[in-house]
Amino acid sequence: MSTPLYFPATSSPLYRLDDETDAMALTDQMSARLAQLQALLAMTYGDAGDAFRRMAQSHRDDYLWACYMIAGEVRELGDALLVQRRKEAGLNA
């Protein structure tokens, strides 16, 4: 598959998916990253958000940057999953 993954901190591919990566592996990775993102974001609002709001501005920026990067990775994994599903269905990617 060799789908390049671009992360917000780099301008070139940092990782490439293995040619043997199947739709299930992509789905599992997406699910894991979404669960992590949900947990991170749960700490930014409501009563739990008090600790977040007390963080230094630079820490809040880095925290939200991590959330942003995870969201970008999930988007890229979704794109790769679409390509993989088309490939498995015998359609042109």
Give the ranges of each region predicted by the language model:
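Sequence/structural signature of long amphipathic alpha-helices
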Residues: M1-A93
